[in-house]
From Swiss-Prot:
Lineage of producing organism: Bacteria, Pseudomonadati, Spirochaetota, Spirochaetia, Spirochaetales
Subunit description: Fourteen ClpP subunits assemble into 2 heptameric rings which stack back to back to give a disk-like structure with a central cavity, resembling the structure of eukaryotic proteasomes.
EC number: 3.4.21.92
Active site (catalytic residues): S103, H128
Role, per record: Cleaves peptides in various proteins in a process that requires ATP hydrolysis. Has a chymotrypsin-like activity. Plays a major role in the degradation of misfolded proteins.
Name of the protein in question: ATP-dependent Clp protease proteolytic subunit 1
Protein's gene: clpP1
Domain of life the protein comes from: Bacteria
CDD domains found in the cross-reference section: S14_ClpP_2
Pfam families listed in its UniProt record: CLP_protease
Enzyme class: hydrolase
Length: 203
């Protein structure tokens, strides 16, 4: 299904003094400093997003980047690679949730530049503790369980940092799937504004 969807990516034609040039729609949006995080956050997806962030920084280190998020989450380490890059680069990263930002995707949403984190009205956010299948001999299970707890502590700290909630409150909320509407995510501090309509298109 996903391969079929990728085969349906539209192309746009641009006219210039040198003639016509065609772009797939995502490459065209990248020219306007727009990046999409779509679907599960895997190592491959994280690599692509990080590469685009670094490329846009090299093009203009002073101009904002817009990160549109519609994702159920994914691998914690992959998500943290994107998160760390967002915090590391010079341009401020504006985050916009459409559809959903769940699990690690919610960390990326909250990690946008202060005052520049948005959610569309019908979107939702979900936070929960990291999870993973642990198997093997007892010593390996213990090591993996400790790593899961370390990642949980790390994500709690990041949510607390960006939302203004206490770590105790975030820890309590993350014990189970914790769903928030766009307005609730705004009240919680994950986003700053529920975006209704903008006056001028960026593209």
């Amino acid at each position: 299904m996903r391969e079929r969807m990728h085969n349906l990516v539209p192309y746009v034609i641009e006219q210039s003094g040198g003639g016509e040039r065609s772009y797939d729609i995502f490459s065209r949006l990248l020219k306007d400093r727009i990046i999409f995080v779509d679907g599960e956050i895997t190592d491959a997806v994280a690599d692509l997003v990080v590469a685009q962030l670094l490329f846009l920084e090299s093009q203009n280190p002073d101009k904002d980047i817009s990160l549109y998020i519609n994702s159920p989450g994914g691998a914690v380490t992959a998500g943290l690679a994107v998160y760390d890059t967002m915090q590391h680069i010079c341009p401020e990263v504006q985050t916009i949730c459409l559809g959903q930002a769940s699990s690690m995707a919610a960390v990326l949403l909250a990690g946008g530049a202060p005052g520049k984190r948005f959610a569309l009205p019908s979107s939702r956010v979900m936070i929960h503790q990291p999870w993973g299948g642990v198997q093997g001999q007892a010593s390996d299970v213990c090591i993996q369980a400790q790593e899961i707890l370390r990642l949980k502590t790390l994500t709690i700290a990041y949510f607390a940092l960006h939302t203004g909630q206490s770590e105790e409150q975030v820890r309590e909320d993350m014990e189970r799937d914790f769903f928030l509407s766009a307005e609730q995510a705004c009240s919680y501090g994950i986003v700053d504004t529920v975006m209704k309509r903008r006056k001028h298109a960026q593209v």
